Amino acid sequence: MKLGLITQVRDEIDIIRAFCSHADALFDRVYVVDHQSVDGTGKYLKSIIAGKPGWRYFFLDSKTKIQTAVGNFVMKQAFDDGVDALFFLDADEFLLAPSRKALEDSVKGLPGDECAGSITWKNCIREEFEPPVFSFNDPLWVPPLESKFAKLVVP
């Protein structure tokens, strides 16, 4: 099964390293759309994506809010590349999947190829906001309930 991820980012230097590591462990294809980052996010992404054949970087040189159109364009690219299931995450969103196999099993549990599925998550917050760069070792406040919102998964 080939899993893909689309993420749209802007000025995420504080969390992008952890997010890319997380994405690399779970996804075969990663499509990153950079919405004019000026904090070093774009430079970092270009440097790591150069060594990852399954990753693509897009720079959106426009100040308009066209996330839906961009997402649709990149989604077509992903399915043209043979992705079996496609996730949409922001750079500050991490899937609670103990392994790649567990994530694949979740996808296999979706209703079918003609119907999109969804996943839920918990909105965690760092207990301390220093240092400015996020690490998986940072203590987090984890709420008892999942968010009332869901993330889309397209098979």
Residue ranges: model-predicted function:
Residues T68-N72, A97-P155:
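Catalytic-site signature of metal-activated, phosphate-bearing donor transferases
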Residues D90-F94:
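The conserved acidic donor/metal-binding loop of glycosyltransferases
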Residues D39-G40:
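Acidic/polar residues in short coil/turn loops that connect beta-strands
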Residues K43-F88, S99:
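Active-site-proximal specificity loops/subdomain of glycosyltransferases
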Residues D28-Q36, F58-L60:
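Short beta-strand/loop segment that forms part of the nucleotide-sugar
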Residues D24:
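Gly/Ala-rich phosphate-binding loop of Rossmann-like dinucleotide-binding domains
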Residues K2-S21, Q36:
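Active-site beta-to-alpha loop of glycosyltransferases that engages the nucleotide-sugar donor
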